[in-house]
Amino acid sequence: DFNSPLTVEKDDWGLAFVNVLKTSAESASLYNLWYELPQEKRYSHTYGKKRSALDHIVIAKTLSDGKGIEYKKGTFTPFIVPYMLESDGVPKRWQISDKGKGKHLGEGFSDHLPLTAIFHTISE
């Protein structure tokens, strides 16, 4: 959870993730797995009506060289299950009591969707 958007838009705060680590679809050494998904699927967080990719899995390109540990291409995705979403598709946030010290009410999840990817070993 870097809390850094994938790209900078007019009203974004701070630097975009691609600027911080110099990642891109063409990067020589690092690859952000968001680039595997179409633009409209690149989100793990929703604030209001704005969807953004604040969470990232960045891999070294050596994880796709056919040696040792390997990223299984095409397996990256936000983990989305219905019980983790509100009826409008927004992640169901933790429910915190507004009384006292903000006690968790035992309902809801993070406001960020988890990211998943499959890695495996290559037998030599």
Locations of regions flagged by a protein language model:
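Metal-dependent phosphoester-hydrolase catalytic domains
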Residues: N3-E124
